[in-house]
């Protein structure tokens, strides 16, 4: 697959899957918690929540662990789109080169920007 334009901390929206009225996540927005580059998946806060059954055991401190937990599962990167922070709508990502003066030297850095509004992304 191509380049991954989504980074940790970005706001994304689910663009495919079951509609929210039917219990799905399409149209929902959330913050990216982690990016799995090897499998082209992202972990999004509050999206793709699944029930996980863990075996009962003891932690290092002696407290009981295990039971039924609801956790987020990774979702494929092609199923989400980046949200422009200024317009709150989905957008594509572009890159531009900017010269920044740091420590008395000029350095060229790549800056991500939202193609819909042209504003820089964090």
Swiss-Prot record:
Disulfide bonds: none annotated. InterPro entries: Rib_uL2_dom2 (IPR014722), Ribosomal_uL24 (IPR003256), Ribosomal_uL24_KOW (IPR041988), Translation_prot_SH3-like_sf (IPR008991). GO terms for cellular component: ribonucleoprotein complex; ribosome. The keyword Ribonucleoprotein applies. It comes from the Bacteria. The keyword Endoplasmic reticulum does not apply. GO terms for biological process: translation. GO terms for molecular function: rRNA binding; structural constituent of ribosome. SUPFAM superfamilies: Translation proteins SH3-like domain (SSF50104). Keywords: Ribonucleoprotein, Ribosomal protein, RNA-binding, rRNA-binding. Part of the 50S ribosomal subunit. PANTHER family: MITOCHONDRIAL RIBOSOMAL PROTEIN L24. Belongs to the universal ribosomal protein uL24 family. One of two assembly initiator proteins, it binds directly to the 5'-end of the 23S rRNA, where it nucleates assembly of the 50S subunit. One of the proteins that surrounds the polypeptide exit tunnel on the outside of the subunit. This is Large ribosomal subunit protein uL24. It comes from Renibacterium salmoninarum (strain ATCC 33209 / DSM 20767 / JCM 11484 / NBRC 15589 / NCIMB 2235). The lineage of its organism: Bacteria, Bacillati, Actinomycetota, Actinomycetes, Micrococcales. The gene is rplX.
């Amino acid at each position: 697959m191509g380049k991954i334009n989504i980074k940790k901390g970005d706001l994304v929206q689910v663009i495919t899957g079951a509609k929210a009225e039917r219990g799905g996540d399409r149209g929902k927005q959330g913050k990216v918690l982690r990016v799995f580059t090897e499998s082209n998946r992202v972990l999004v806060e509050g999206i793709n929540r699944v029930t996980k059954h863990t075996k009962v055991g003891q932690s290092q401190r002696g407290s009981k662990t295990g039971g039924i937990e609801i956790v987020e599962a990774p979702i494929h990167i092609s199923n989400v789109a980046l949200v422009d922070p200024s317009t709150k709508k989905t957008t594509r990502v572009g890159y531009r080169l900017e010269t920044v003066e740091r420590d008395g030297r000029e350095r060229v850095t790549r800056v991500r920007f939202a193609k819909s509004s042209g504003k820089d992304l964090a």
